[in-house]
């Protein structure tokens, strides 16, 4: 997925306006609720998958860090995700989960920005999360 300079500007603009940890925790809760099988690698959460729960908050911090890296390297997300991709493969994360989280983020962005989440912003965010999913899947074999 190629991120154009125009889309990169949209992405950095969106990312700068978010309460990143809150938005990420809500996106994670949405994934865990809609796709309950995604919780299988989070046994330490003891069945607590709400945005405000400590396990979700802790994982949200990690996801925010990974997304911060992607935003800083929009034109080469794969390179920044090599080790993280290897780690996710090692622990057995299904690559489809990355796409599901991206879809949940799109819902959260639409809820947050309402009419401000224009088709152009939606397209940029969609491509960003597709690129992130690709980067996180890049070392799977």
Swiss-Prot record:
Organism of derivation: Bathyraja eatonii (Eaton's skate)
Family in the record: Belongs to the globin family.
Main function: Involved in oxygen transport from gills to the various peripheral tissues.
Positions contributing to heme b binding: 59, 88
Gene behind the chain: HBB
Expression sites by tissue: Red blood cells.
Keyword set includes DNA damage: no
Keywords: Heme, Iron, Metal-binding, Oxygen transport, Transport
Any Pfam family the entry gives: Globin
Oligomeric and partner information: Heterotetramer of two alpha chains and two beta chains.
Gene3D superfamilies (alphabetical): Globins
A cellular component term, taken from the record's GO annotations: haptoglobin-hemoglobin complex
The Globin domain, residue ranges: 2-141
PANTHER family (UniProt xref): HEMOGLOBIN FAMILY MEMBER
GO molecular function, one term: heme binding
Protein name: Hemoglobin subunit beta
